Amino acid sequence: MAKCEFKSLPDAKLQRQRNTSFSFSYDEINISETLSNYAKGKTYYIHTYGCQANYRDEEIISGILAKAGFLKASDENADIIILNTCAVRENAEDKVFGKIGELKAIKAKNKNAIIAICGCMVQQIHIINKILDIYKHVDLIFGTHNITDLPKLLDEIILKRNKIVDVKSQPSLIEENLPSTRLSSFKAFVNISYGCDKFCTYCIVPYTRGKERSRKMEDILNECRELKEAGYQEVTLLGQNVNAYGKDFKDGTTFAKLLEEVAKLNIPRIRFLTSHPWDFKEEMIDVIAKYDNIMKYIHLPVQSGSSEILKLMGRRYTSDQYKQLVTLIRSKIKDVYLSTDIIVGFPNETEEQFQETLEMVKFAQYDSAFTFIYSPRNNTPAAKMTDNVTREEKSSRFKRLVAELEKSVSASSMAMVGKTFKVLVEGASEKDNSMLSGYTEGNKLVHFKGDLSLVGKIVDVKIIASHTYSLIGELING
């Protein structure tokens, strides 16, 4: 059995602390002769779970491996297999454990294959212990704060054939000039910040992603300029809380100022994810309204319509404050589309508090929504709360919430019928490969007949029919 070397392990106490000693690095990734020789003729495969930030991490990991000389494989029959994981909910973790188990057969066929687990899940010590105890075929575990150590870690595995665990509790660098293999040739994710300082009581992200750290504005703008010059049609600015961007600079830098500078680059489409209502200022609303190339789509997670539950969640706003923000957004941004996240079954949520959430849904008239039953996360304050809400009641409330949401989502889709919208074509429809699919500026999915040569282009599509979560259209002047 291979020896396991523990380089660093996550510490929940350290993860709660806000380390402010990080710095900026512009050093390029170095690839050793050992790794480049090993990579010749070998392949890699990455399976990513979770949010857009994880997919951006995949692009960087892929870029590092490509720089070393590895070729990208289309399936798990590869020489390096990496699972890039998500820890937001238990269901996501269960999927990862299932996949790790499946990889045992791959390892049996190719004993020299290197199986690695990275991402948010392994920022938790109990997850690392479970992997080491049960899944003996895993060779490498590394965290969210040391992706760029991957070449050195692979060097050691190749030379020593050891297992390695290297998961740091806190970040120390914001690294620029990283290699990247983009997942799309026309849509791009651009990190503007990392981490979160909000510490909502149910959320694991501040522990797995660390303190809020903003990239320098000029570095972000340079990346966006390069994407514009390369012909990208859409750029999404990413952060766990984008509208807290710049708070760590102490020089008056704000997300609104960054967003305006990005808009001036004339990239056809600009989006951003994700916003926290507490930091959503009127200055930001005005910038969105001002520029046509900033999509009139805002993801504004409410989580609950009850002020009492919001307080228990540590969300920092009341139900009335959220409603005032929605009213302000709709008054200033014409034809804005709103989406949200909602959690039902938070510990001790009463029926009356749940009814307040249903009332919020009726008030906000969301165009789309992501709904979840509360999932306890290890070491978070909410996980330690007593909970008298039964599983059956949580499930019932979830179904009732979805039914209420579908009313506004369906109404939003039906209101688009007969109108023409600009759609960025993403590819063949997953439901019917004889059709194309793409998204409107308001992030509505549209299926329509058209030639594959239109992929990556923005076209005019008239909506002729609606379903709750998608639309049917016909190409104009196609």
Please report, for each region that a protein language model flagged, where it lies by residue:
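A structural motif corresponding to the C-terminal lobe/cap of the Radical SAM core domain
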Residues: 293-296, 308-424, 436, 457
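Glycine-centered loop/turn positions within well-structured domains
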Residues: 148, 198, 243, 307-308, ...
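Proteins enriched for Cys/Gly/acidic motifs involved in redox and nucleic-acid/cofactor modification
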Residues: 2-245, 283, 320-331, 355, ...
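Short flexible coil/turn linkers enriched for glycine and charged/polar residues
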Residues: 183-186, 196-198, 294, 304, ...
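Conserved SAM/AdoMet-binding glycine-rich loop
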Residues: 112-117, 124-126, 229-351
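Terminal RNA-binding accessory module
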Residues: 2, 7-14, 384-478
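Thr-Gly-centered strand-to-loop micro-motif
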Residues: 118, 369, 448-449
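Conserved, mostly hydrophobic/aromatic
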Residues: 200, 220, 237, 272, ...
